[in-house]
Amino acid sequence: HIEVGMGKGRFLMDLARLHPDINYIGIEMYDSVLLRALQKREELEENGEVYSNLFFMRVDARLLPEIFEKGEVDKIYLNFSDPWPKARHAKRRLTSREFLARYDQILVQDGKVEFKTDNKELFEFSLEEVEEAGWNLEASTFDLHHNEEMVQGNVMTEYEEKFSSMDHPICKLIAKRRCLL
């Protein structure tokens, strides 16, 4: 499982702790952000926590198909990604058709993308892109924390906690890779 744009890494650290049988890779393109995640992990490990199933990589997400083999990744998490609000930057959005095509190259046959955001416009864009790319939308909600089914097992990110505490609804979608016969 990978998280693209992992930020400080807490989400993946929580998942790695909950599921020691699954390997997690955090992808981050900014050195300063990656350094903060490494420091946080080191601090937790000094207190006795073990993260043998957690790895971090400094890489641009556009290069994912060059790093991972076809069918190597089970799940991709996109949490509170930069919305790139200007129309001319739409291809930079991590839920654009261009990025979905990259994910399609590395996911297993029934691989999934899970996306969370507080940005309704980005979420609506993402729903359209999933459909246009021919992916199967397994589930979606404009208010995760009031959707009993989708909130089950939810691991919150730092941004999610912050925005939820301010009563901002959190949007979430789960898209399944398009089936190629």
Regions found by a protein language model. Give the residues of each.
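Conserved SAM/SAH-binding beta-strand->alpha-helix loop
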Residues: 30
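Class I SAM-dependent methyltransferase "Motif I" SAM/SAH-binding loop
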Residues: 4-7
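A short glycine-rich, Lys/Arg-flanked "PGG" loop and its adjoining helix->strand segment in the class I
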Residues: 95-109
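Glycine-rich SAM-binding Motif I of class I
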Residues: 9-13
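Short alpha-helix adjacent to the SAM-binding motif of class I
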Residues: 35-40, 125
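S-adenosyl-L-methionine
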Residues: 39-71
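Class I S-adenosyl-L-methionine
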Residues: 126-128, 132-181
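Conserved beta-strand signature within the Rossmann-like core of class I S-adenosyl-L-methionine
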Residues: 110-117
